Amino acid sequence: MTDSHKRIRKNCICISILLLAGAGLALYLVLSGYEPSGGDIWGHLYKSQEMYESLKKGNVFPLFSPYWYNGIQLFRYWGPLSYYIMAGLMFLTGGDLLLAYRLLAFVIFVVGGLPWILWGIHENRRVLGTFFGLLWFFMPEHIRIYFTAGNLPQMVTTMLVPYAIWFLWLYVRKKNNCAAVGLFVCMTLMSFTHLMVTAIMGVSAFLYLLIDQIWNKDTRRKIFALIYMICGILTAGIWVIPSLKGGLVTSESGDGSVMSTLIYPLTTSLNPFKRLSAGNDSFYFGLAAVLIAIAGILLARGGKKAGFVFLLIMLACTTPAAYRILVKLPFSQLFWMTRFAPMIYGFFFSACLEWVRLKKKYCVLLAALLCVDSISCMNLDFYSVATSDETKMEMQQLTKLTDQRTAVIDKSSYGSYPSYGISGSSHTMYTYGWAWQGAATGDNIVLLNEALDRKYYRFLFDRAVELGADTVLIRKSDLEKQDITISDIEQDAAASGYSMVQEMTTAYTYKRETPENFGTVTGYYGLAIGKYANEMTLLYPAFVAGSSDVIEDYSVEELSRYDTLFLTGFEYRNQSKAEAILTDVAAAGTRVVIDSTHVPANKSNKQEMFLGVFAQQIHFDERYPVLSYQNSEIRSDDFAEEDRDFSTAYITGTDTEIGTFQMGNQKLTFLGMKDDLPNVYFLGLNLMYEAVSRKDAALVDILNDVLGISNEQLPDRELVPITIAYKEDGLSIDVDADFDQETGVNTSIAAQDIFTSDQELSEQMNLLVVHERHTEISFVYPMFVPGIIITISGFICFILCICMDVRDRRKHIV
C-alpha cells in the first residue's frame, strides 16, 4: 500500500468515526423519543413546518403567514436558511417534523465537526482533529444553545463557524487564495441564518486578527480577509436590507437590558459544579479550555498564541466589570458576550491545532481535560426543557373552542409551545406567537401584557375584540399573584361580551359569540397623542392612541371627530402651527386636555411652554399635598416605592384656576384654563401617570371630570362578518354587511408594508382597515430594489477584490 493510499485510508477512518458518532447521537434521540427541547424550539419548529408546507406548494419564500400575531412576515426578520434545512429534512422524513428535529442533530454534529477533521488532515494531526470534531457539538455553550435555549438559527450557526475560521486560517496563515471563496460563502450563509451572530463572527475575526498581528505581520492579507467577509454579508443584501427595517434585529440592537442578562461572573462561568446546581440555563464556558489557554500562552511559540489570548480576553468581557465598559462603546448592541462563545471555542481549537510542537502525551492530557470538562454535557436529559402533557392538552382544548382567533394571555409562562400547538398542529389563528419583536402588532401585544400585569382587564378584553380574538385564555397563576379571583374580572369580561366557558387545570377560557370571521367598526370617544398615549389608554379604553406623536401630522377635521383629545409627551415641528391646529379643534367643540408635565421645551427660550402656559418644576416626597378641586379637598394615596422621590411640574399662565394645592405660603395650580381658550384644559403634576400606575380612585375621579369620559367607558364596537381567502401571493377580503366606507372595517389582520391593492387600505392600531365591500391584496417582496442592488454590489466587490488579490500575488511572485 502506497503512502497516498495510507493517507486516504486514515482520512476515511477519521470521517467514518465522525459519521458513526453522529448517527449514534441521532439514533439515541430517535429511540428514546427525545422531545423537542428548549425555550424557543417550538416557535422555530412551527416556522420550519410553514417553510415545508410552502415549498410543497412551490412557494420558495413565503412572504406572509396569517397564523401568528394576526399575520406576520415569518422569514423577513428570521434568517431562512435554518428553516430550509429543517424543511429539507422533513422532505426526507415524509413530513415528520419530530423525526426531522432528531435528524438535525446528526447534520449539525457531522457538518460542524468535519472542518476540524479536515484541519487535522491538513496539519497531519488527524487524531487531535478528529477529537475536536467529535467534541465540537458537546462544548458547554453549544449544548445549552441546542437543548436548553432551543434557538434553531444559532444551532445552525455553530456548524458554520468552524468553516469560517478554517477558511480564514487557510487564507491568512497558509496564503491560500481559494480559501477567500470559502470565507465569502460562509459569511453569506451565516447572514441568511442569523444576522446578529454573523456580525459577532465579523467582530471576532477582526479582534483575533488584531491580536495575531502582534506576532504574525501580514496586514494586507488580514485586511483582504475582512473585506471578503464583508462582501459575503453584502451579498445576502436581498434578505438583509428588509430585515433591518424594524422587527427583531432593530429591537435586539437597542436592548441593553438583555445584554446585561448575558453577563456572568467568573465564579459562574468557570465553575463546573455551579452549572449543575444552578440549572441547565446557567452559562458555563469551560474551565479546561481556560487552563489550556493559559498554558498555551506560556508555552506555545509566539505565532501560535493568538487563539489562546483571544479566549482569555473575550472571557474577561463576559464579566460584570467588563459590562460597564462595553455598554458605553459604539455598536455596544453587538456585545452579547455569551453569543461569542462558538467563535471563542473555534479560535481556541485552531490554536491547539497550530500548536504543533505540543508532544503527544500532552495532547492526550489536553484531550482528557476537555473530555472531563464536557462529560456532563453528554447527559442530554439534564439539558432538556420539555413541554408538559398538561400544556399540550390545554392548547388542544382551546383550539376546539376557537372560531377565528385566540389570545393566550400568559406572559410566555407556557413557553413556546402554544406558538406551535395552536398554529402548527391545528392551524388556528393566534393573537400571539413567538418573538413578538418581528410583529406589526408588537405594540398591541405589549399593551395586552401590561394590562394583565396592572390588572386592567377591562382594557384587555376590549382590545382582544379589536384583535379579532373570540377566545381569551388567562392563567390561574396570574390571578393568584394579583390576589384576585375570577369573579373580580367577570364584569370586565362581560362588558366586552365574553363569558367564562371552560375551567382548565391551569387556566380559564373566555368566549365571545361572534361570526365565524369578523372585523370591527369602532367609535372611540377620545384620542391620545404623544409618547405616553398608549399607557393612558390602559385606564381609559375609550381612548385610542394616535399613529403619530407630532401634532402637525393630524388635520383639524380628523381631530374634531373625537369628544376629547389628550396630549401627553407630544411633539411638534412648528409650535405656532401646532397651537393653531389645537385652537381650531377646541373651537370645533372637541375638549383638549394638555398634560403640561410633558410639554416640549421651546426651541428659542428652552422653556416648557405651550399656548402661553408654562410648566414649572417641583418636587414631592412620599405623596402629593392635599389637592383642592371644585371646593373639595383631595387626599391621594402614597406614591409607589420607586416614585417616593417624585419630580413633576405645576402650571403657570392660566386665567382660571380649577385645581390648586398649597406649597408653604404659595397656592400653586395643577389644573387650569385660559379665557381665550374655553375648551382647553392644562393639567399638571403628572396626574395621569400616577392614576394609571396606582389606580388611585381620588385622582381617577378628577381625571374623569377633566376628560369628560369615564374610565369605565368602552368604545362603541360593532362586529361585522367578513370572508377572507388567503393565497400564496395575496389575500381577498369581502365585507358581508353594509358599512360606512369612509370609516372602513378593521379586519383584525396586522397591517403590513408588503400589502398592495387597487382598493383603498388604511390602518388603525396596527391593524388593516378596508373601505370597500371587496378588496384584493397582493404581497410584494419588501425593499426588493435596494436589496438586489446591495447583493449585486457585494458580489461585484468580491470579484474585484479577488482579481486585485491574485494580481498582487503574481506581482509578488515575479
List PLM regions with ranges.
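Extracytoplasmic
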Residues: 114, 176, 368-676, 682-697, ...
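A glycine-rich phosphate-binding loop feature that marks nucleotide/adenosyl-phosphate handling sites
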Residues: 248-252, 410-417, 721
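Membrane-embedded transmembrane-helix bundle of lipid-linked glycan/lipid transferases
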Residues: 1-386, 390-395, 453-458, 467-477, ...
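Short amphipathic C-terminal alpha-helix that caps PH/PH-like domains
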Residues: 347, 695-710
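Active-site proximal loops enriched in glycine and acidic residues that flank catalytic Cys/His/Asp
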Residues: 191, 201-203, 237, 319, ...
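Hydrophobic, well-ordered secondary-structure elements that form the walls
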Residues: 343, 356, 406, 472, ...
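Active-site-proximal, structured, solvent-exposed surfaces of multi-pass membrane proteins
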Residues: 2-8, 530-531, 710-814
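Short, solvent-exposed coil/turn segments at beta-strand boundaries
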Residues: 467-468, 654, 674-679, 727-730, ...
